[in-house]
């Protein structure tokens, strides 16, 4: 009698570089927590060979994939269908191979951000929010923030025209229902304190800071940096020096977006708290 092994679904994350990725660890933990049978690997795709690598993965049994820099826009172009978040972001971080062989693209970055913010703050309803940066990371978070009920979303960027372009795009959605909540300002035009300041730029990775005025930070301001590390980021250190009430890094967003991807593939959303704690401990050990 021949015993056949059950087929285990394959998932992966594609990037270049990819060795630093925490995704295999995160999804491995999610699989264990939910008792889902799957494998998840990191794949280093050649800069000029992402499409071929992805097609090879899917043709050899891959069911879904995450995509990180620099391939999110290329992945977007390969999709047969898109979620609303992905369509507006112009980039995808999650690919699903559907039963008919087509590829669906999602962008779970903003959903992961909002989930992490709510876990810390309880609600985003009516908050005055400043979003620093107007690149892909910012663009993927605007709709989830608006859907979470923020009262005002001001977008600021070194190049103000990019911030204005984003405001113009999102102001036209749903017959203009978000128009009164959105505003683009240069960094020198920012006035008054914000309840929440989100840094979507990668400046902290180089130990740099966007040229923001100190006046945006008040004694109740919460600051969030999408970057993360074993030590507080440069942006969060600056925020604390200005008197911010609380600072949060992007590790929870990383785990949160992964949980949303996992749920799209497996129809079960894992608990993020346990995995976030493990990942935080792992970061400390790697110092």
Curated annotation (Swiss-Prot):
Reactions listed under catalytic activity: shikimate + NADP(+) = 3-dehydroshikimate + NADPH + H(+)
Biological processes per GO annotation: amino acid biosynthetic process; aromatic amino acid family biosynthetic process; chorismate biosynthetic process; shikimate metabolic process
Enzyme class name: oxidoreductase
SUPFAM superfamilies for this protein: Aminoacid dehydrogenase-like, N-terminal domain (SSF53223), NAD(P)-binding Rossmann-fold domains (SSF51735)
Single GO term (MF): NADP binding
Positions that bind NADP(+): 133-137, 157-162, 226, 250
Recorded superkingdom: Bacteria
Gene3D superfamilies reported in the protein's UniProt record: Leucine Dehydrogenase, chain A, domain 1, NAD(P)-binding Rossmann-like Domain
Pathway entry: Metabolic intermediate biosynthesis; chorismate biosynthesis; chorismate from D-erythrose 4-phosphate and phosphoenolpyruvate: step 4/7
Active site positions: 72 (proton acceptor)
EC number(s) from the headed UniProt entry: 1.1.1.25
Sorted UniProt keywords: Amino-acid biosynthesis, Aromatic amino acid biosynthesis, NADP, Oxidoreductase
GO cellular-component term (any): cytosol
Binding site for shikimate: 21-23, 68, 93, 109, 228
InterPro entries associated with the record: Aminoacid_DH-like_N_sf (IPR046346), NAD(P)-bd_dom_sf (IPR036291), SDH_C (IPR041121), Shikimate_DH (IPR011342), Shikimate_DH-bd_N (IPR013708), Shikimate_DH_fam (IPR022893), Shikm_DH/Glu-tRNA_Rdtase (IPR006151)
Pfam families in the record: SDH_C, Shikimate_DH, Shikimate_dh_N
Subunit structure: Homodimer.
Biological role stated in the UniProt entry: Involved in the biosynthesis of the chorismate, which leads to the biosynthesis of aromatic amino acids. Catalyzes the reversible NADPH linked reduction of 3-dehydroshikimate (DHSA) to yield shikimate (SA).
Xref: PANTHER family: BIFUNCTIONAL 3-DEHYDROQUINATE DEHYDRATASE_SHIKIMATE DEHYDROGENASE, CHLOROPLASTIC, SHIKIMATE DEHYDROGENASE
Family label: Belongs to the shikimate dehydrogenase family.
The protein's name: Shikimate dehydrogenase (NADP(+))
């Amino acid at each position: 009698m021949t015993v056949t092994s059950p087929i285990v679904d394959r998932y992966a994350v594609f990037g270049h570089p990819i060795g630093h990725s925490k995704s295999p660890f995160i999804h491995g933990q999610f699989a264990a927590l939910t008792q889902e049978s799957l494998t998840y690997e990191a794949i280093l795709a050649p800069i000029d060979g992402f499409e071929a690598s992805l097609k090879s993965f899917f043709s050899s049994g891959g069911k879904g994939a995450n995509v990180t820099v620099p391939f999110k826009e290329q992945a977007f172009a390969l999709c047969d269908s898109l979620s609303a978040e992905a369509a507006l972001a112009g980039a995808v971080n999650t690919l699903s191979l559907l039963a008919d062989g087509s590829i669906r693209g999602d962008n779970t970055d903003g959903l992961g951000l909002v989930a992490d913010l709510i876990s810390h703050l309880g609600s985003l309803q009516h908050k005055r929010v400043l979003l620093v940066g107007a690149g892909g990371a910012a663009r993927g978070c605007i709709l989830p923030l608006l859907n979470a009920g923020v009262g005002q979303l001001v977008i600021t960027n070194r190049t103000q025209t990019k911030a204005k372009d984003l405001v113009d795009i999102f102001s036209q959605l749903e017959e203009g229902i978000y128009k009164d909540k959105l505003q683009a300002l240069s960094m020198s035009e920012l006035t008054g304190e914000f309840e929440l300041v989100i840094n979507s730029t990668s400046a902290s990775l180089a130990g740099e800071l966007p040229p923001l005025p100190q006046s945006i930070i008040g004694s109740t301001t919460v600051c969030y940096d999408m970057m993360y590390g074993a030590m507080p980021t440069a942006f969060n250190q600056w925020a604390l020096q200005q008197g911010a009430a609380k600072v949060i890094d992007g590790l929870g967003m990383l785990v949160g977006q992964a949980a949303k991807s996992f749920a799209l593939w497996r129809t079960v959303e894992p608990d993020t708290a346990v995995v976030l704690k493990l990942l935080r401990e792992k970061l400390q050990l790697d110092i």
